[in-house]
């Protein structure tokens, strides 16, 4: 698809999920809460701040990947929401629209007073991570035989969060995120490369010369 593609999504229950549907007692047994695709979930979108606040009160670390806004309005109360989000995970286009900025530096300057970690995914250009002070650049792992890019951003999130919840340095979290995002593109369907840990490790070593 190069850098542009279209997805068709059947929302199903996403349209109806409400804050009151969430079992916070069950959530309290988790270490981390990740929320994605909020613009496709109208029933809970306006309660995101309450959801993330509750998760933090329960002692969880948190992350948010807004993903694309199909209506392209980009209306989120970031100043209220991001104080409860440990890791903000938009891609480059989403970040610029959400922060109403033309550059990464401009966007970070707008968000830095109330954001924690800002991680910006940028496709074949890799990713950027801001830790509250410095910007760290992570180059992409190049896959010369791309099968499918669907789910690459989600796979980046998973790899990053896996290291983040183990308190590894931001640079290592970014590296693992970039690797799992690239591994995703070697199989079709968004999850094909992650059938089991052994398969994922084999792909990492054979395709990217990386021991996972």
Residues of each region from the PLM?
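Acidic, amphipathic alpha-helical patches
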Residues: 22-23, 78, 107, 146
């Amino acid at each position: 698809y190069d850098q542009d593609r279209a997805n068709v999504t059947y929302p199903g229950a996403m349209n109806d999920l409400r804050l009151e549907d969430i079992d916070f007692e069950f959530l309290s047994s988790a270490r981390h809460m990740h929320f994605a695709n909020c613009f496709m979930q109208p029933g809970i979108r306006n309660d995101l701040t309450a959801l993330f606040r509750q998760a933090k009160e329960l002692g969880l670390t948190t992350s948010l990947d807004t993903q694309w806004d199909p209506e392209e309005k980009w209306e989120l109360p970031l100043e209220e929401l991001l104080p409860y989000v440990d890791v903000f995970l938009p891609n480059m286009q989403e970040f610029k629209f959400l922060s109403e900025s033309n550059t990464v530096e401009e966007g970070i300057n707008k968000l830095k007073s109330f954001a924690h970690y800002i991680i910006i995914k940028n496709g074949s250009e890799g990713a950027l991570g801001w830790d509250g002070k410095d910007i760290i650049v992570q180059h992409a792992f190049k896959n010369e035989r791309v099968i499918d890019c669907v789910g690459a951003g989600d796979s980046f999130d998973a790899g990053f969060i896996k290291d983040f919840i183990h308190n590894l340095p931001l640079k290592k979290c970014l590296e693992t995120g970039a690797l799992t995002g690239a591994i995703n593109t070697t199989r079709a369907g968004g999850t094909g490369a992650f059938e089991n840990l052994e398969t994922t490790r084999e792909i990492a070593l054979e395709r990217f010369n990386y021991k996972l």
